[in-house]
Design a protein with these regions (language model features):
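A broad detector of the eukaryotic-type serine/threonine protein kinase catalytic domain
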Residues: 63-66, 130
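Active-site cleft segment of glycoside hydrolase catalytic domains centered on the general acid/base Glu
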Residues: 69-73
Length: 228
């Protein structure tokens, strides 16, 4: 399997989900701030079965995202690789790595996660670490964990009602681009401040002919003192 063109880079669990596959109305910090990457490039995938399925994906990318397609191919190789191990017990083990270079600073991201699915129950936990070369910025830590349970409806317009709860966290985050500070120095700045969040809610999943999901969520944010 191969793909060329605009795509969601094969990296992380939650950031790799399309909008209709998201469980919450608002994406996790990993999917929205720290690990969200769409880009232009080429990727290949390979499936193998060793008693259980293994899905391997890797690609080379422009590194500039979707809106600034110039000169990035000549700045170095930007790559991403991902492996999924679909164990027979209902556990999906995922590991991925990505390297980009948005400026003279190389950013390398490492991600690992577990998804457990049994009947109507789904539990997921994911951790991402983001490293900046040249000690340009302190490494970023991000975590996302949630639980989802589906209550199946036998009659009426609803196919199921899902109850969900999530906790996610991120430390101070930089996009890897340099900005001029008050002293005229070119430095990386904090684009997204350290925060944590709890989310709870329900999802109403309608059956035919109106196949759609209605997500109703409550969010509570926690910021460090004087961070914003």
């Amino acid at each position: 399997q191969s793909t060329i063109g605009q795509m969601r880079v094969p990296f992380t669990i939650d950031a790799h989900r399309s909008p209709h596959q998201q469980y919450f109305a608002n994406r996790s910090f990993i999917a929205k701030q720290v690990g969200n990457v769409r880009d232009v490039g080429a990727a290949v995938g390979y499936n193998v079965n060793v008693g259980f399925p293994i899905i391997l994906e890797a690609g080379l990318f422009n590194g500039s995202g979707l809106t600034n397609q110039k000169d990035y191919w000549t700045k170095g190789t930007n790559y991403s690789a991902k492996a999924q191990f679909l164990l027979p017990c209902g556990l999906n083990v995922v590991g991925s790595i990505q390297k980009v270079k948005p400026s003279d600073v190389t950013v390398t991201m490492y991600d690992g996660g577990l998804t457990f699915h049994h009947k109507q129950l789904l539990i997921e936990a994911e951790y991402l670490y983001k490293h900046y070369s040249k000690d340009a910025f302190e490494g970023v830590h991000a975590f996302d964990g949630f639980i989802n349970y589906d209550f199946l409806m036998k009659k009426g317009p609803l196919q199921k009602i899902s109850a969900l709860a999530r906790y996610d966290f991120m430390s101070n985050h930089s996009n890897g681009k340099r900005y001029e500070n008050s002293n005229g120095e070119s430095v990386l700045k904090v684009n997204d401040y350290k925060r944590s969040r709890i989310t709870s809610g329900i999802t109403l999943s309608f059956a035919k002919p109106f196949i759609s999901d209605v997500r109703i969520n409550f969010e509570k944010y926690f910021y460090a003192k004087n961070s914003i």
